[in-house]
Design a protein with these regions (language model features):
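NAD(P)H-binding glycine-rich loop region in Rossmannoid oxidoreductase-like domains
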Residues: 6, 12-76, 80-83
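Oxidoreductase cofactor-interface core, primarily capturing Rossmann-like NAD(P)-dependent enzymes
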Residues: 1-3, 9-19, 34, 56-57, ...
């Protein structure tokens, strides 16, 4: 198996078997509290970096500081990856949301109105858009050290791994969304890291992941 490093805010609900896994190094911290040197050490030697960071679903988490939690984390992680000056490009995966639309994706008038409201009134939505835009516009497709994929799940739920689909654009409007199991998101991200053909298919893109309906 792989050697992993993870940064977690809390170990309260962490499975004991993972705590005892010799291939797993756990860094207990809020990511933005790490110094530049600590951030560099966290990513040094990593072939891939995956971020599932998000705002907690409370009033303070959604409207308190830092309002651009994900954006600042993405910026600092990318700076740290660049500073390692690895001979091989590092894969960077960001879990985002299907509510963040790709430039040029078709949206209805109603969706455009709602997304505009969310962008201006709900800081986490703006944060999701800005973090993906940073990768798209600042890292781009020809970066010397980083390749990226932004993974867009629909309505997240907790359940076991199941069959899922991956498509380039959302198959439904935000008013008629689908569900995505968190475990399926994790599985897809791991598959992207492990399978060169899958990475080549989605690098520099924003694939949508959702549970496959049982017929």
């Amino acid at each position: 198996g792989y050697n992993l490093r993870i940064i977690v805010r809390s170990l309260d609900k962490f499975p004991q078997e993972l705590l005892e896994n010799s291939k797993l190094k756990i860094i207990k911290a809020s990511l933005l509290d790490l110094s530049d040197e600590q951030m560099l050490e966290a990513v040094k030697g990593c072939a891939a970096v995956a971020s599932c960071l998000g705002h907690t679903m409370s009033f303070k988490g959604m409207f308190g500081k830092p309002r651009t939690l994900v954006l600042e984390a993405v910026k600092r992680l990318c700076l740290a990856i660049t500073a390692t000056r690895s001979a091989d490009k590092t894969k960077f995966l960001l879990m985002n949301t299907v509510g963040n639309r790709n430039p040029g994706e078709r949206v209805t008038t109603g969706e455009r109105f709602i997304l505009s409201l969310l962008r201006n009134l709900i800081p986490p939505h703006y944060d999701n858009e800005a973090s993906a835009a940073f990768l798209r516009d600042n890292i781009g497709s020809e970066n010397e050290f980083i390749e990226w994929v932004v993974v867009r799940p629909d309505g997240l739920i907790n359940a076991e791994i199941s069959n899922y689909e991956v498509v380039a654009t959302p198959p439904r409007t935000i008013f008629n969304g689908l569900t995505t199991t968190r475990a399926n998101v994790a599985h897809f991200m791991c598959e992207c890291i492990e399978q060169s053909s899958l990475w080549f298919q989605w690098k520099g893109k924003m694939p949508v992941v959702f549970n496959k309906k049982i017929k």
